[in-house]
Amino acid sequence: MEEIDLCWRIQNSKFKIRFNHNSEVFHANAASLKQTNPKKTYLNFRNQLFMVTKNSKNNLFFLLIEKFIIDAIVSIYLLFDKGFNHFIAIIKAYVSFYKHINLLIEFRKKNKRHLKHYQTRSIIFKYLFHKR
């Protein structure tokens, strides 16, 4: 997720993202925390909220409402699939987000978002309702 945030901030600063197809990337996915660790769930949800708030050009209010609804559905799923600790981790992520929201809004105001956003649609709804 950090690499997405970095690319988003680079583009918002009017730089361009390039790639080299000859490069080789070694990525230790979840090297520090295992997928079963609720702390990983907490960090993933919190960092998503921070990233969207800092970088999105869209109307933040409606975007966060949509994200909250999706996250609420996911949290209920995780409650039954992975247990109570993952459910609580998502609640803690939102508490942390609301504690930091003033700083995130300040960051938004200071840093202009210059991206020409394309129309985005939820891949979750696309998967659930269109089976793609």
Roles of regions detected by a PLM:
Residues 12-105:
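Active-site-adjacent helix/loop segment of glycosyltransferases
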